[in-house]
């Protein structure tokens, strides 16, 4: 199994955090990583390991993005004006799979990616099957009519585990939402602390 397809719960155990705030996460029951060496006594982490962990958490949260793609987001964040760490968060939250997840059309980022890849989502009325597609402010994201009664969508909409953030607007009856604005870090409802500034430090070494 590739690292990108690694079980979401295995990612939680490896990182030692409940990345998506799911009630079923094994991290809620155990405080050590997966495998036979998971219970070893932890040493004081180095600056490098802290920065690496911050990067792995952010990559993992968005569906275990590949290193190549994640680095592209970082490089683009550097090129843009303003704070690099905020730019990075803004780019990640503009991914279509992230927006579909925020709109509660999918229960996890992994499910969102698969849902989009299978052609169940439109942007401004046109089918888009690329999870990494970057939406723009004002874009309208909708579940296709033929997909609105799928159990995966209905289950996600009804889950009480999370709310939709203020930078998206959603009508769950019509399965339609609008991306209102690009968020900053403080807007994003991460269940765990994300530290994009440490990601910037990691790549700036």
Swiss-Prot record:
Pfam families: Ribosomal_S4, S4. SUPFAM superfamilies: Alpha-L RNA-binding motif (SSF55174). Keywords: Ribonucleoprotein, Ribosomal protein, RNA-binding, rRNA-binding. One of its GO terms (cellular component) is small ribosomal subunit. InterPro entries: Ribosomal_uS4, Ribosomal_uS4_bac-type, Ribosomal_uS4_CS, Ribosomal_uS4_N, S4_RNA-bd, S4_RNA-bd_sf. CDD domains: S4. Residues 26-46 are annotated as: Disordered. GO terms for biological process: ribosomal small subunit biogenesis; translation. Gene3D superfamilies: Ribosomal Protein S4 Delta 41, Chain A, domain 1, RNA-binding S4 domain. Part of the 30S ribosomal subunit. Contacts protein S5. The interaction surface between S4 and S5 is involved in control of translational fidelity. PANTHER family: 30S 40S RIBOSOMAL PROTEIN, SMALL RIBOSOMAL SUBUNIT PROTEIN US4M. Belongs to the universal ribosomal protein uS4 family. One of the primary rRNA binding proteins, it binds directly to 16S rRNA where it nucleates assembly of the body of the 30S subunit. This is Small ribosomal subunit protein uS4. The lineage of its organism: Bacteria, Pseudomonadati, Pseudomonadota, Alphaproteobacteria, Acetobacterales.
